[in-house]
Design a protein with these regions (language model features):
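An alpha-helical, amphipathic repeat domain used for nucleic-acid recognition
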Residues: 1-157
């Protein structure tokens, strides 16, 4: 069961119960796996956070991933508290780059701008982080051109 990927305590407990083991046997087996070092929610939470950051996910996505894996609250809080703002910033920058490559006209067309923002929000970044990142990268204005009230180049319908 643990051969394919690391599992949380709750995942192991659920799988054993689904296979029909008695709760006392399940509890004893979970305790044995923890003592043997084969079951560690803190290590799992750290690894899951690193994995999510590598693919450009933000803090909210990390929290959601840890909940899906049913990692204990203490282990999740510890792993999240160890996150470096710089590492999270790198993940955000990568996600911004991906989003702007995917939607090349995002600076000029309101719908494309909304798509970029939705993409980044779906990856777990907060709106404040997005505004700051887009502003720092000079991507909140279309190439420094004059813009109308909607932020579009003059004359764009």
């Amino acid at each position: 069961m643990l051969g394919r990927r690391a599992l949380s305590r709750a995942e192991v407990r659920e799988r054993l119960e689904r296979r029909g083991f008695e709760p006392t046997v399940v509890g004893a087996e979970v305790a044995r796996l923890e003592r043997a070092g084969l079951l560690d929610d803190v290590a799992l939470a750290r690894a899951e956070c690193q994995s999510q950051l590598r693919v450009g996910r933000g803090r909210r996505a990390l929290v959601a991933a840890l909940r899906r894996r049913r990692v204990g609250r203490d282990a999740a809080d510890l792993a999240l508290s160890e996150l470096d703002d710089e590492v999270e910033g790198v993940a955000l920058a990568a996600a911004v780059a991906t989003a702007t490559r995917k939607h090349k006209w995002w600076r000029r067309l309101p719908e494309e701008r909304r798509k970029v923002v939705r993409y980044l929000l779906a990856r777990g970044f907060s709106l404040d982080q997005l505004r700051r990142a887009l502003h720092e990268n000079g991507r909140d204005e279309p190439h420094g051109e004059e813009t109308d009230d909607a932020g579009d180049p003059p004359g764009l319908p």
